[in-house]
């Protein structure tokens, strides 16, 4: 093994150096303080859990993303957490057992076996919130507002909010009574926005002419808020669940606008991200210059059923590393340089400055690196028996 081999990191595993690490930590504190002010309690899930609980109710996507290992004590299979949300759902259902709404937040690093197709990293630092125990639209509105407020705290300027609702597609497909094979083919075609394939599949497999028109129109219903008016016309004879979903999306759009949140709303009624996992509205927030969503979330009711308590739930997550890149942070230069000296009063002066929040770096005997290299812009200087802070010459 060469020296170069010893410092190589696995693909997608990264280290965070100054000043980016400082920026991440400042942002972590700011976001968790924000969530606390909204009433969200911090939880810290384990890094590794048994696969039985870690992958419950999440479908195959998370299974493929999970690093797996054998527990040397029990012989059971374990997995490194690739997504915090299922863990927090378990904590709500089994560990906390609160009867009313439970607001929980978290910030922890997860590991993924494969890199996200939009991001190279396999060890994102996931920060977010989950609201359990309330099935109403007010809970969805709250988490969307909190996600947008968090992006503002992170320094995001222009934000594009993409809204969708899993219930629309689910209700139409249920009414069409498609076979499992036909539904899978239709799902994949809609995900690709392959209009011609959708048209052909629906014309072949759906007998109701009204449902044919609705399913063929579904992937074409995307754009600004005017899409909702178009959808009400297209889905005039649709199952009641479709109109209920449109009403929810209308209310979400209104909530974003009425609260003067800086976000341009975009709708995609065929957004099927997390179809096996989400049960209602889904959203993603984008910022110009970034190809991937900075915040993703939605409603995922009944995830806790496998743990003995089916609870309505909604929430979102963000990658702290990605958020920290919104504002370029140069090396900080705000320290106070203290000499390597034993003169009276120096230690007390340093202690007072540090207690007041100042960054004080004391030279070590024989040190050749000066205050500029240590990113200091001031220095402690003795004058007439007193230590004073003065600008560096």
Swiss-Prot record:
CDD domains assigned to the protein according to its UniProt record, in alphabetical order: HisRS-like_core
Pfam families attached to this UniProt entry: tRNA-synt_His (PF13393)
InterPro entries assigned to the protein according to its UniProt record, in alphabetical order: aa-tRNA-synth_II/BPL/LPL, HisRS-like_core, HisRS/HisZ, HisZ
GO CC aspect terms: cytoplasm
Alphabetized UniProt keyword annotations: Amino-acid biosynthesis, Cytoplasm, Histidine biosynthesis
SUPFAM superfamilies tied to this protein: Class II aaRS and biotin synthetases (SSF55681)
Domain of life where this protein originates: Bacteria
Pathway recorded for this protein: Amino-acid biosynthesis; L-histidine biosynthesis; L-histidine from 5-phospho-alpha-D-ribose 1-diphosphate: step 1/9
GO BP, one annotated term: L-histidine biosynthetic process
Cellular location(s): Cytoplasm
Subunit structure: Heteromultimer composed of HisG and HisZ subunits.
Its biological purpose: Required for the first step of histidine biosynthesis. May allow the feedback regulation of ATP phosphoribosyltransferase activity by histidine.
Family the entry assigns: Belongs to the class-II aminoacyl-tRNA synthetase family. HisZ subfamily.
Other notes: This function is generally fulfilled by the C-terminal part of HisG, which is missing in some bacteria such as this one.
Entries under NCBIfam families matching the protein: hisZ_biosyn_reg (TIGR00443), PRK12292.1-1 (NF008935), PRK12421.1 (NF009086)
UniProt cross-references to HAMAP family, sorted A to Z: HisZ
Protein name: ATP phosphoribosyltransferase regulatory subunit
Gene: hisZ
């Amino acid at each position: 093994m060469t020296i170069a081999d010893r410092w190589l990191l696995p693909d997608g595993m990264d280290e965070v150096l100054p000043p980016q690490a400082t920026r991440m930590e400042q942002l972590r504190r700011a976001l968790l303080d924000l969530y606390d002010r909204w009433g969200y309690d911090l939880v810290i899930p384990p890094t590794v859990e048994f696969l039985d609980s870690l992958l419950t109710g999440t479908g195959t996507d998370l299974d493929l993303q999970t690093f797996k290992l054998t527990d040397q004590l029990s012989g059971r299979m374990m997995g490194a957490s690739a997504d915090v949300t299922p863990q927090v759902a378990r904590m709500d259902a089994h560990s906390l057992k609160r009867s009313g709404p439970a607001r929980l937040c978290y910030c922890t690093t997860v590991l993924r076996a494969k890199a996200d197709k939009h991001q190279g990293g396999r060890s994102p630092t996931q920060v977010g919130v989950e609201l359990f125990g309330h099935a109403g639209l007010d809970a969805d509105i709250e988490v969307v507002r909190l996600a947008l407020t968090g992006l503002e705290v992170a320094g995001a300027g222009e934000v594009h909010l993409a809204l969708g609702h899993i219930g629309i597609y689910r209700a139409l497909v249920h009414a069409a009574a498609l076979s499992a094979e036909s539904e899978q083919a239709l799902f994949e075609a809609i995900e690709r926005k392959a209009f011609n394939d959708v048209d052909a599949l629906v014309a072949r497999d759906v007998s109701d002419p009204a449902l044919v028109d609705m399913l063929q129109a579904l992937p074409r219903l995307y754009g600004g808020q005017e899409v909702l008016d178009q959808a009400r016309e297209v889905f005039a004879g649709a199952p009641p669940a479709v109109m209920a979903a449109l009403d929810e999306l209308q209310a979400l759009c209104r909530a974003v606008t009425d609260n003067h949140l800086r976000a341009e709303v975009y709708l995609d009624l065929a957004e099927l991200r997390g179809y096996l996992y989400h049960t209602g509205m889904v959203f993603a927030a984008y910022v110009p210059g970034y190809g991937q969503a900075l915040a993703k979330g939605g409603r995922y009711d009944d995830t806790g059923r496998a743990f003995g308590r089916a609870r309505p739930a909604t929430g979102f997550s963000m990658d702290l590393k990605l958020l920290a890149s919104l504002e370029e942070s140069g090396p900080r230069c705000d320290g106070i340089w203290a000499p390597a000296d034993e003169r009276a009063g120096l230690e007390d002066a340093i202690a007072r400055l540090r207690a007041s929040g100042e960054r004080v770096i004391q030279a070590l005997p024989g040190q050749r690196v000066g205050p500029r290299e240590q990113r200091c812009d001031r220095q402690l200087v003795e004058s007439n028996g007193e230590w004073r802070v003065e600008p560096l010459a």
